[in-house]
Every structure is written in C-alpha cells, then in structure tokens.
C-alpha cells in the first residue's frame, strides 16, 4: 500500500494515478477481495510490476531490455529437462510440479462452499420427514423400547440418527464429487496448468499470464449441466440438496470461468522485457503478439553483464555446467588422450625356453666359429636369403651360392664317379675330359637338378597363389560394395543427426566426429624392450576415464537442498533415516498454491487452504474431514441432541420400568406396582433419579447428607399430604452410613406408599418389621 501511495505522490500525470488505481482494485485493496491475507507476500513487486502499464510505448521507449529468452534463461529450461544430465536429487522437482495439492484444494473448496450452504430448517425438515415415514419419532421409540430402560432407548435413538446421518452424508458427497469431477476437464493441466506455473518460478521467478475480458457467453460447462440434470432426483428427495448442489455448481462454474479467462504463457515463445528505470516487466507472445502481465515472485537483479534471476536454477546452473564439463572432459580423455593399445611383455627364464630353440642352438654349435662353419648355419642362411628375395629370378642365384658354399662337402667323393657310364650323357664319354671333367659335370648336374626342383615346387606354389588371389579379388569386390553401402548409410544418418538436435546424449558435432575418425594410430616401438629372452604375453585395450562420481553426488545433494529449502518441502524419512517421499508442507502450500489461486486464477471463493495432512488423504477421507468441519455437522449434532432428549423425556413421561435390585440390597421401589398409582409416579417425580441411580451414587461416594429435591405441590393435594407427613423442617434426610440409609429409605418407601394409598381411599395397616 505504501508503494501505491508513493506512486500518487511522485507522479505528475494522470496515467500513473490510473495505473496505481487499477493495481489497487486488481489486488483487492478496497476490501472486496477475500484473499487479502496473501497480499503481503507479493505486495511490493506485484504492485510495481503491474499489468497494462506502458504498452503504448513498449518496447520503443528507452530503458527496456530483453531478459528472456536469452542463452542463460533457455539454459535453465534445458537443465530442468535433463539435457545436461540427471541426478537423484533432481527427482525432487517432480514432487514440486505435482498437481495433487491443487486438486485437493479444488475439492476442498467445492465441498466446503457447498456444505456451508446448508440451512438448518432444511436439515430439520428432512429429519422430521424421515422419522415420520419410518415411524421413528420420540414417542414411538419410547412406547416400543422404553421397557428396556432409559439408557437403552437413548442409545437406540442415537443409532437411528447416525444411520440417517451416514446416508445423508454419502448422498451429498457422492453428488458433490461428481460436480468436482466436471472441473478436471477445464484445464488444470492445460493452458493454465500448475506445472507450467512452477516451471516459470523455478527458472526465472516470474510467471507471465494473458487474460481475456470476461464474457457472459461462458455459461455453465456442458458436463456440469448434464450432471445437474441427473441430480434432480436427489433434490426431490432432500430439501437440503437444493441449496447444497446449487452452491456447489456455482463454485465450479466460477472456477471454470477463472481458468478459461487466463492462460500461462509458454516458455519457448514468450519474450520478457524489463525496464530498470520504471521497474516494470512486460510479456509478449512471439507468435500472436499478445501482451500479458507478470506475477513476480522473486524480482531479477541488473548487473554489469545483464540480469541475474533470483531463482533456484540460477543458483544451480553453475554447478550443473561444471559437472557436465567434467563428464565431457572424461569422455574426451577416453576418446582422444588415451592410447587404446597396451602391450604386456614377459621375460623368459632359461628353463622356460622351448625345445626347438635348444635343439637349434645345439646343432649350430656353442660358439660363433663353430656356427659359421657348420652345415646348420649355412642352411639357416639359405632360408633367410630365400625369405629376403624380391624377385623370382633370385632363386637360382641364392641356391647356386648355397651349393657353391656347401658343394665341396656334399660332393667330396664325386671324383671316383665314372661319368662315362650310361646316364651321364654322351658328352661326358670323351676321353679328353679326365677325372676333373667328370667331377665338374657331377657338381653342375647336381646344381641344375636342385634349381629345377625348387623352381618346379615354386611354380606349383605360385599357381596356387594365383588361384587364391582370384578368389580374394571376388571376395574383395563384394566387401567393397557392402562397405560403400554402409558408408552411404552412415553419411545419411550423420546428416540427419545434424539436422535434428538430440535432447539427450552426446554433444559431439559432425566436425568433431570427422576429426576423431581421422586420428592416426599411435605407433609403439618395442625394439629396445623385446629381446631374445622376452615375449609378448598379451595386448588389450584400456580406457582411462577421470573419476567424477563425487562431483555427481555433490550435485545431487545440492539439488535436494535447494529445492527442499527454496520451496519449503517436507521430507518423510523412515526410522533408518532413509527418505521415503517428499511432499508439500503448510509453508509450501502458502508459497505456491495460494498465489496460484489468488493471483493467477483470481478465484474469489477459495476458502481456507488445505493442510499438509489433508493433501495426503484419499478423496473419501478428505470428504469426511471436510464434512466434519462444515456447518452441516454442527446442525446435525444439534438435531441429534434434541432427538435424544425427546426420547429420554418420553421414556420418563411413560413411567419407571422394572430394573434389577442394587448389589448392596436396596429394595426396588417399583416392586409392587399397586403401591404407586399411575398418575402420581412418586419415585420418579419426587426423587427424579430412582433408587437404582441413587444407590449407585451413594455406593461410590456416600455423602453425609443427601438433598432430595422438592416437587411443586400445587398440582396435587396428595403430594401435600405426603410432604406434611414425611418432610422435616430443613427438607433433608440425615444419611449416616449405607445401612442407616438402607433402613430409612425402606421405611420411607413404606410410609410413602401407605400415605399414597390412603390418599386414594385404600385403607391398609402399615406393615412394620
């Protein structure tokens, strides 16, 4: 109110006065709004951030700045959606967005308003109609069940009334629940959804809404009209149903109208402008161009770099991004900074070397001189030379050099060979050749034979290789076609991935994927490590990921602490300290639910807010609890008490009933029915409670003197005679102990009986013990 007064005092134009006046009217400061109890929560900022201010110059006027959408504000919404990861603590936000409390508040509002419309006259008339139809009025109950005693008759009357009360309650609540159900289709989760309201508060602390002019064409919702037609039968049976159902329908119609006349603007298509000089916030829809008003729960703060919002996401966003960056760094380290191939090298002991290696060493000799001259070393040298060949023509030279080196050892006895024998050719039979000519021919023939044998073997091997190569070409052609198809499909998927941004998962771009794919393999040189006594035991891939589990755990705890303390939530734990559930507390209901109905919907028939215990109750339990708090319960209690008193009076009026004698020997005053005439009823009229109740009272706490209330004697001459004969000067009997009382009451009973009989003309001698 002080802010509005300052507007009047400081403004020079009529526009500011009109603005302040409209704000005061909208906020119910003139006393017409029943929700003034919540005004103080938002009076400063709600009055300053008023609707319909400056739209004529907005946003061309100097001083306006865009505060949403920005990179920061859109980042808040992504964090809520889990785009930067999701932790256990963030799950508490689902409890904040739950509409359970709003639904319970709507049910309580409709039920309480409807039940408070009950009139006492209607309830009394319905009760009288019921007992007359069932013949259960007080006189009938006393006549039929009075013989069972006064207490039993009253207990029966109580049960009769409770039966009718339960039936009435079930009938009313059933139809009221049906009326409330018609409200759920009106948009509690739609354009004016409570979840959207909470999202705006959690992100920026501001809720922009668009209102439309109230029209008379809204009328009553169609489902409600249908249901009210079905409730006509109940109205014919119960008079109280007319006012109750009419009030309930009126409340539902009012709430539906409030929901239809307002819409909470969407987060992704709304622009928020802030005027620092005038301290105003405006909202505008990007698509429709509609301008709306703003409910500012927590005002923003202007700093050098822009605007800082006073919201939970503003405080949590830095930690969320830091933890996300750490996880991304771990993934980059996994992909880029870690050598994927590791080699495990083992050392051999002398005893672990294979048998073939020891055999080769033994054959080749123990020292280098022996190895150089041994046939085994020459054979190994031949194998190495064959392995290092680059052309097929090198085979002849390699074999000839080996044969020249070893020919003297292989053909040492070739001089005694007679080459003139058949099989060595005619050229060798000449006389001039001699012994040396024969030896040379043998060596040449041996070399030629060995070379031809190796060439034949290699020719067959090469032919097999050509066949294998032809087969591999066919297989390679097929694999090439399949690879090209897969590459084309992969390229198409990458292009689609670039066009459609994923809401979750990896944030690696196309260029980054290309760079990762083009990475060269890391070459590890093991020449200096692996020797003759070493071997490669195993090779494996290893992924190094920097640990970030502690950071995620800390972030989860931050989510829990911020949401619970900011929204005043109530955490329910078991005996072991483990969290079972998170729910709204009474402070949460006042912080979120009350402004939602008061300032967003502007509901004028809200009534009392639901409590924390009522939110967790079932629908049936909530209805019963509200029924007990409504004025209907008070009316029914009064009708019940009056009905029980009527039954009690009727039982007393019809005289005493035969009851068992007291445990300590008091005689029953009604033992002889002829002693007391029917019209007089001496015992009940004179002593009011009877001997049974009197004896019970005296047995527990026997008084020294017992006052017996006097009866007005103007109605009967007989009672005057009784009083004159038995009354003492002070109108009291002395009661010394229970035995004296017993005998005196016995004597008084006899004398009272005889006196009454004399009064009616029955003369009889007093029987004395």
Swiss-Prot record:
Could you tell me which residues belong to the region Putative leucine zipper motif? 458-479
A family per Pfam: Herpes_UL6
Cellular component (GO) terms are: host cell nucleus; virion component
Gene Ontology biological process terms from the UniProt entry: chromosome organization
Keywords, A to Z?
Answer: Disulfide bond, Host nucleus, Viral genome packaging, Viral release from host cell, Virion
- Where along the chain is composition biased (Basic and acidic residues)? 760-769
Q: Where is this region: Disordered?
A: 654-675, 750-769
Q: Where in the cell is it found?
A: Virion; Host nucleus
Tell me where on the tree of life, at the top rank, the source sits: Viruses
Complex formation: Homododecamerizes. Interacts with terminase subunits TRM1 and TRM3.
User: Which family is it part of?
Assistant: Belongs to the herpesviridae portal protein family.
What is its biological role?
A: Forms a portal in the viral capsid through which viral DNA is translocated during DNA packaging. Assembles as a dodecamer at a single fivefold axe of the T=16 icosahedric capsid. Binds to the molecular motor that translocates the viral DNA, termed terminase.
Task: State the protein's name.
Answer: Portal protein
Q: Which organism is it from?
A: Varicella-zoster virus (strain Dumas) (HHV-3)
């Amino acid at each position: 109110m002080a802010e509005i007064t300052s507007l009047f005092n400081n403004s020079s134009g009529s526009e500011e006065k009109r603005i302040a006046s409209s704000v005061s009217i909208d906020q119910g400061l003139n006393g017409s709004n029943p929700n003034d109890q919540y005004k103080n929560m938002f009076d400063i900022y709600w009055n300053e951030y008023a609707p319909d201010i400056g739209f004529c110059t907005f946003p061309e006027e100097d001083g306006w700045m865009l505060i949403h959408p920005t990179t920061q504000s859109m980042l808040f919404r992504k964090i809520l959606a889990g785009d930067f990861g999701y932790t256990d603590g963030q799950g508490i936000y689902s409890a904040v967005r739950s509409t359970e409390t709003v639904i319970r508040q709507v049910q309580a509002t409709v039920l309480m308003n409807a039940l408070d419309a009950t009139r006492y006259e209607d309830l009394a008339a319905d009760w009288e109609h019921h007992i007359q139809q069932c013949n259960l009025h007080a006189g009938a109950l006393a006549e039929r069940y009075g013989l069972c005693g006064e207490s039993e008759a009253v207990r029966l009357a109580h049960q009769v009334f409770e039966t009718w009360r339960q039936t009435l309650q079930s009938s009313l609540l059933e139809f009221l629940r049906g009326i409330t159900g018609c409200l759920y289709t009106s948009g509690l989760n739609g354009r004016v959804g409570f979840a959207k309201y909470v999202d705006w508060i959690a992100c920026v602390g501001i809720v922009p809404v668009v209102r439309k002019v109230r029209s008379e064409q809204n009328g009553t919702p169609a489902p409600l009209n249908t249901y009210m037609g079905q409730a006509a039968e109940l109205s014919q049976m119960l008079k109280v149903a007319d006012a109750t159902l009419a009030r309930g329908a009126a409340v539902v119609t009012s709430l539906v109208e409030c929901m239809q006349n307002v819409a909470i603007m969407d987060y992704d298509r709304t622009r928020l402008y802030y005027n620092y000089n005038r301290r105003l916030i405006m909202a505008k829809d990007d698509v429709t161009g509609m301008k709306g008003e703003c409910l500012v729960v927590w005002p923003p703060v202007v700093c050098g770099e822009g605007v800082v919002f006073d919201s939970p996401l503003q405080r949590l966003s830095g930690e969320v991004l830091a933890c996300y960056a750490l996880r991304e760094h771990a993934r980059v380290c996994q992909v880029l900074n870690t050598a994927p191939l590791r080699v495990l090298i083992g050392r051999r002991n002398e005893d672990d070397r294979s048998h073939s290696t020891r055999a080769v060493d033994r054959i080749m000799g123990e020292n280098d001189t022996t190895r150089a001259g041994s046939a085994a070393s020459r054979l190994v040298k031949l194998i190495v030379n064959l392995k290092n060949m680059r052309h097929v023509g090198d085979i002849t030279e390699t074999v000839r050099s080996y044969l020249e080196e070893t020919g003297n050892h292989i053909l040492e006895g070739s001089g005694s060979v007679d080459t003139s024998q058949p099989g060595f050719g005619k050229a060798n039979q000449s006389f001039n050749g001699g012994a040396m000519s024969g030896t040379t021919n043998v060596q040449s023939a041996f070399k030629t034979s060995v070379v031809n044998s190796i060439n034949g073997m290699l020719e067959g091997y090469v032919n097999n290789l050509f066949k294998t190569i032809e087969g591999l070409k066919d297989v390679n052609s097929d694999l090439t076609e399949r690879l090209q198809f897969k590459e084309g499909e992969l390229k198409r998927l990458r292009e689609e991935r670039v066009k459609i941004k994923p809401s979750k998962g990896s944030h690696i771009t196309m260029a980054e994927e290309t760079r990762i794919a083009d990475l060269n393999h890391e070459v590890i040189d093991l020449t200096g490590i692996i020797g003759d006594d070493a071997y490669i035991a195993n090779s494996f891939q290893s992924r190094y990921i920097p640990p970030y589990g502690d950071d995620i755990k800390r972030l989860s705890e931050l989510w829990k602490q911020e949401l619970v303390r900011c929204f005043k939530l109530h955490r329910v734990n078991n005996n072991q300290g483990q969290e079972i559930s998170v729910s709204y507390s009474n402070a949460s209901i006042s912080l979120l639910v009350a402004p939602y109905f008061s300032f967003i919907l502007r509901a004028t028939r809200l009534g009392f807010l639901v409590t924390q215990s009522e939110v967790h109750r079932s629908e049936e339990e909530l209805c019963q609890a509200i029924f007990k708090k409504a004025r209907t319960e008070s009316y029914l209690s009064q009708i019940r008490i009056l009905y029980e008193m009527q039954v009690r009076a009727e039982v007393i009026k019809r005289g005493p009933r035969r009851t068992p004698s007291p445990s300590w020997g008091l005689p029953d005053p009604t033992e002889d029915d002829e002693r007391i005439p029917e019209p007089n009823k001496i015992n009940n009229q004179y002593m009011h409670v009877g001997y049974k109740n009197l004896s019970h009272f005296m047995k527990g706490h026997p008084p020294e003197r017992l006052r017996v209330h006097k009866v007005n004697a103007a109605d009967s001459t007989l009672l005057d005679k009784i009083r004159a004969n038995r009354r003492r000067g002070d109108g009291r009997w002395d009661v010394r102990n229970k035995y004296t009382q017993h005998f005196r009451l016995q004597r008084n009973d006899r004398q009272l009986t005889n006196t009454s009989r004399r009064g009616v003309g029955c003369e009889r001698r007093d029987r004395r013990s």
